[in-house]
UniProtKB/Swiss-Prot annotation:
This is Neuraminidase. N-glycosylated. Homotetramer. Ca(2+) binds at residues 293, 297, 324. Substrate binds at residues 118, 152, 276-277, 292, 371. Its EC number is 3.2.1.18. It comes from Influenza A virus (strain A/Ann Arbor/6/1960 H2N2). Residues 36-88 are annotated as: Hypervariable stalk region.
Amino acid sequence: MNPNQKIITIGSVSLTIATVCFLMQIAILATTVTLHFKQHECDSPASNQVMPCEPIIIERNITEIVYLNNTTIEKEICPEVVEYRNWSKPQCQITGFAPFSKDNSIRLSAGGDIWVTREPYVSCDPGKCYQFALGQGTTLDNKHSNGTIHDRSPHRTLLMNELGVPFHLGTKQVCAAWSSSSCHDGKAWLHVCVTGDDRNATASFIYDGRLVDSIGSWSQNILRTQESECVCINGTCTVVMTDGSASGRADTRILFIKEGKIVHIGPLSGSAQHIEECSCYPRYPDVRCICRDNWKGSNRPVIDINMEDYSIDSSYVCSGLVGDTPRNDDSSSNSNCRDPNNERGNPGVKGWAFDNGDDVWMGRTISKDLRSGYETFKVIGGWSTPNSKSQVNRQVIVDNNNWSGYSGIFSVEGKSCINRCFYVELIRGRPQETRVWWTSNSIVVFCGTSGTYGTGSWPDGANINFMPI
């Protein structure tokens, strides 16, 4: 090959290589732009939905790596999929209840700044559980705690802390309220907060930290709600509210709320005669509530709420071992599943129960006359058979030498089933302990277990003589 041919050959090869490199640089540039704008192609979401992203797979040979050394590839981050809760899993099968949490608020109040509270409850978002209570606008070691036996004042607020964290001075005050309910729909918290004049109160509906809706008193006689968690299924939440006499006929309505906005209000129907302070739980696709009849019955009313067509029915727990306080002795108490038993119906106390096939799990004070002690058990046939009284799996939660109070249910979704848990309010101070001028509480919390368990008693535990007056 003569020199001219060599020059031509080298030039041709060089030109070919340069052309290939140029084309590859164009390809890399196009790839970079594609990665930046189309790394994750998301379809336009439907209303209130976030669709999953599908990554584009880009293949390239090893040679391209050389040219990517100084190239920055930015990836688009897909938003996390957030869905409404539907509670469609079955209820967990349990043998009883195991200890879960205790906040010791009163004992801690002897030497620290802890809120004066009552009407506590527990509710969980998909990842964590929280405790709520209605604060009295004061700490215990404070002269403002004098007279906190009273239920309603403009200073009461709904408090919210992670479960197990007592209500210290840094506690969030969610809203102004002397009656409340809270629940998480899978996306955000809904708080129902009632406050104002007894004859003209207001219920505010706060969703995701914003006031979305409100409703005024419809009977001008202490509008009030559950004092425990509401329930949301597929984005619609339901809460039971009553306005009217505490010892006679009242007007109970069931409200349906979507992202804080009231979408439907239904009147109570069925055979229940008086409804207060319901403890509600999801029973997919519906919601079931066990309430307090403060007028005619020491057997507890049941409300069944259809979340699809908004229909409502009511009755009474069948168990002849009734759940309210005060009540008759077990040997003489009755329930026919449909009507109030007309046995010591007034006043009553907030409580809970839940169905388990034909049986019923329930909790109640040990004393039939006072809010002292606390026990749980299952009644065989207690959900389906009138006046059933066969009791099994009894547990003492608080011995009868110590005070209890309100109690309520909350539900926790596990990997395969929905567990039922409950809390007990441990009231201290007035009216029973007149050495002090305040009324406040701590709580103890138990959850259902399929395992074995032991015995014990979990009272408040504060020595009243150590407490500020």
